[in-house]
């Protein structure tokens, strides 16, 4: 819902400013690029407006929806929360993605253990994730490595934000423990309980 509102406001802003907002299959590459550039400009403007209006829940919903690359909404919003010491908003923004990636990894680990009786951790560590993702083959071990990398990237980014915002030491320690358990694949579902914060 928030994504729809956001998109409508971007479209309105583009129209009000005489910028292209609709394309066709017959558009030239130049026309398509101009439209996409205009959309990005409009997105940044509406993001700025919504931040000024403190429409944080809606922006977090947009970020969680996955319709935009992280550098469009997620990262600028996280940086705003850090700069303004909005710890609860930062938690709500960041924890969900980490939890989902870790849950996906746990689910795939369970499937692998059910199918093969054990987990080959060394093989998982040696998987080149970008090559696996670019390929067309599927394997539980490759998926575990993919989710592990995604979760670790998210945790490391979050830990950086937490250090900047001077988060409570005990919470930062929980994040570090989670990072270790994801890294060595010893994570359990109960380890994610502290990461279910809601506004």
Per-region residue spans from a language model:
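N-terminal alpha-helical interaction modules that lie
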Residues: 2-67
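Generic helix N-cap/helix-start motif at coil->alpha-helix transitions
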Residues: 29-40, 66-75, 101, 128-136
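Conserved small-residue packing positions in alpha-helical repeats and bundles
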Residues: 47, 78, 135, 142, ...
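Alpha-helical solenoid scaffolds that mediate protein-protein interactions
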Residues: 66, 97, 104, 151, ...
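Non-Sec secretion/translocation targeting segments of pathogen effectors
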Residues: 197-199
């Amino acid at each position: 819902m928030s994504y729809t509102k956001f998109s409508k406001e971007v479209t309105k802003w583009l129209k009000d400013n005489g910028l292209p907002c609709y394309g066709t299959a017959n558009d030239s590459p130049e026309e398509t690029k101009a439209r996409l550039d205009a959309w990005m400009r409009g997105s940044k403007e509406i993001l700025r407006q919504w931040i000024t209006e403190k429409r944080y829940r809606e922006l977090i919903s947009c970020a969680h929806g996955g319709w935009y690359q992280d550098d469009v909404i997620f990262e600028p919003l996280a940086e705003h929360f850090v700069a303004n010491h909005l710890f609860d908003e930062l938690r709500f923004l960041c924890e969900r993605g980490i939890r989902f990636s870790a849950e996906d990894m746990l689910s795939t680990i369970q499937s692998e253990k059910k199918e093969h009786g054990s987990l080959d951790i060394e093989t998982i560590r040696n998987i080149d994730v970008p090559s696996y993702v670019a390929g067309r083959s599927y394997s539980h071990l490759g998926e575990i490595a993919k989710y592990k990398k995604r979760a670790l990237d998210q945790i490391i980014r979050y830990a950086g934000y937490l250090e900047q915002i001077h988060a409570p030491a005990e919470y930062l320690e929980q994040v570090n423990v989670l990072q270790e358990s994801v890294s060595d694949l010893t994570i359990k579902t109960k380890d994610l309980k502290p990461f279910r914060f809601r506004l």
